[in-house]
Amino acid sequence: MVGFTPVALAALAATGALAFPAGNATELEKRQTTPNSEGWHDGYYYSWWSDGGAQATYTNLEGGTYEISWGDGGNLVGGKGWNPGLNARAIHFEGVYQPNGNSYLAVYGWTRNPLVEYYIVENFGTYDPSSGATDLGTVECDGSIYRLGKTTRVNAPSIDGTQTFDQYWSVRQDKRTSGTVQTGCHFDAWARAGLNVNGDHYYQIVATEGYFSSGYARITVADVG
């Protein structure tokens, strides 16, 4: 994701299914994209962002479940989880993930002080994001090898508007669509690699991201300790 600027849409969040009003046919024909929003739904924090370039629909379902379908074009990311995040959390996820092209399924979040966007990538489409990052080695977590990396975004959108910030990556080489992520293993590995992991957490979600691709995902998340 290039970043997220929060949009408070509490009334939409309460309904669970976020979409344009039925009477707004012109806008539906133009974008057919769920409006950007974030907030609480059925005990979980969700975030949904799109640059408007793709035909995309995000829907909050019961509990920790969400659904996304998207078409070619643009950048989008959404999912459910918690706010605030934690360095050490056991996150179980499972469901359906069917990308066509460049896409990630990841534990995803932000910290402030420093401002950092981080990804623990469990599955991806045609592009391994660690291949474009500064190589920080590997770590074994949750039964697989993850490639560690760092990138820097300059004057890019973020949770605090346009900023320059680092992105931390931990990318699983044995892809999976279900399992449990021990986030502490990854934060510890980043710290050993010299990265600052002492920031103040904002949200921490299991997100599906698409970048000029298409696909479908229906994911359920839970905190299991």
UniProtKB/Swiss-Prot annotation:
Modified sites of kind Pyrrolidone carboxylic acid: 32
Catalyses: Endohydrolysis of (1->4)-beta-D-xylosidic linkages in xylans
UniProt KW Lipoprotein keyword: no
What keyword terms does UniProt attach to this protein?
Carbohydrate metabolism, Disulfide bond, Glycosidase, Hydrolase, Polysaccharide degradation, Pyrrolidone carboxylic acid, Signal, Xylan degradation
**Activity's dependence on pH:** Optimum pH is 6.0.
**Influence of temperature on activity:** Optimum temperature is 60 degrees Celsius. Thermostable.
Q: According to its UniProt record, which residues of this chain constitute the active site?
A: 117, 209
Q: List the disulfide bonds.
A: 141-185
EC number(s) given by UniProt = 3.2.1.8
Q: InterPro entries, per this entry?
A: ConA-like_dom_sf, GH11/12, GH11_AS_1, GH11_AS_2, GH11_dom, Glyco_hydro_11
What pathway annotation does it carry?
Answer: Glycan degradation; xylan degradation
Know the name of this protein?
Answer: Endo-1,4-beta-xylanase
Q: Which gene encodes it?
A: XYNA
